[in-house]
Amino acid sequence: YQINTGLDNMVGGTGWSAGTWGRGTWNSSAEVTVETQLRLWSHDNFGEDLLINPRDSGIFYWDKTQGLTTRAVELSAATTGAANGTKTSVPQVVKQILVSDTDRHVIAFGSDGLGANSSATQGDGVQDPLLIRFSSQENAIDWFPTATNTAGDLRLGTGSTFMQAIETKREILVFTDKSLHSMQFIGPPLQFGI
């Protein structure tokens, strides 16, 4: 389905027509500045397919084998390519995604929590701005941690919200509003460390 691409820059309004229609009287200024946030997107390759995330929204999946005329679908609803199979606790609201180059985990920053149990197909829908979740290795749809997969999560200890993640050669730099963390792949049983 189609997703609104959003604004390409921050728009502020202070005069008549700032805010919702009919909010104030004709030719009167607004009491408070109204700002409309730009929409930020993150995306990364998962093999030949594409994972897409509009900030503070869900994760979408585009399957190359379906051709250029086929739109991306929500990862929790995808049924083709690497997204074909049993889905467990797929995040529903995320600030940014990336696929780690070293070990091919899909990582969701500023994510919602796990679903109610291991058979839940979606996360709980309540965004935690400091929660980092990662899928099982080489599997974009298995997010519920079990003894037989490598899915898991981490919570940042400082700051109040996740800002940005940047992947470097051997680590992922994770910025919050107050701190910078180094996230590294350390292998089983924890997978990642901060």
Describe each region flagged by the PLM.
Residues Y1-I194:
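Recognizes the extracellular SEMA beta-propeller fold with strongest preference
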